[in-house]
Amino acid sequence: RKEYLLFQKTLLNNNCNNYYLNILNLNKIDNLIKKIKPDFIFHLAAQPFVLKGYKYPKWTYDTNVTGTLNILEAIKKNKIKTSIIVTTDKVYKNDERKKSFTETDQLGGDDPYSSSKHICEILVKNYNDIYFKNTNINVVTVRAGNVIGGGDRGKNRLIPDFFKTKKEMYI
């Protein structure tokens, strides 16, 4: 995997373990959690491309929604005390304003990617209200925007597209 090369170059692989598996396979997720007994889960797995969501809506919903549901089930079954589920700033209703969103702004993803991530937030709220209330299990969501990582060479991605232009940037 090309994206794994950056992970190795930064030597992060010397300080932590990294596992690749299919987010749709609950049994593999559950078996891995039983094996490694993590202190926390940091869930970033996703189909992260807005435009691919239009082209492949079922894959987008399966990966993002069912994948998150599988993580929540594994958290519940294995009683993982702390978990962070990463969603996106795309969950906000895009009203074309020229200012940053706030936590209290209206939600409303209008495409498969955005709405799938909004559904993930609803799932986390439901699990917190139904299954994790009055327990020591804490699951939160965070909304990230324009996440970049090793191997991110996708089309129509802000940061990779900027570097492809090979122009100077003034700040």
Features from the language model and the residues they span:
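N-terminal Rossmann-like NAD(P)+-binding domain of SDR-like oxidoreductases, especially those catalyzing
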Residues: R1-G150
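Glycine/proline-rich active-site loop of Rossmann-fold NAD(P)-dependent oxidoreductases
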Residues: H118, T135, I148-D161, E168-I171
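Generic recognition of well-ordered alpha-helical segments
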Residues: L123-N126, D161, T165
